[in-house]
């Protein structure tokens, strides 16, 4: 079985039926100034049972493309958000 990428982030939006938008933060070193800066990217993840809410911290695993922009499937919910 091939290695599957895993991403960890915060749910920022419920983007439709069985879909959530997750904001993933990564830290990179700036090429010129050598300072660690944060970079953010949003991914659409597939949530089969509609169990996530806005603010939850989740882990998603890479899968085959489920739609034009959706290539990750929900693996687990690490922490629930405060609402």
From Swiss-Prot:
InterPro entries: NA-bd_OB-fold, Ribosomal_uS17, Ribosomal_uS17_bact/chlr, Ribosomal_uS17_CS. One of its GO terms (cellular component) is cytosolic small ribosomal subunit. One of its GO terms (molecular function) is rRNA binding. PROSITE patterns: RIBOSOMAL_S17 (PS00056). Gene3D superfamilies: Nucleic acid-binding proteins (2.40.50.140). One of its GO terms (biological process) is translation. Part of the 30S ribosomal subunit. One of the primary rRNA binding proteins, it binds specifically to the 5'-end of 16S ribosomal RNA. This is Small ribosomal subunit protein uS17.
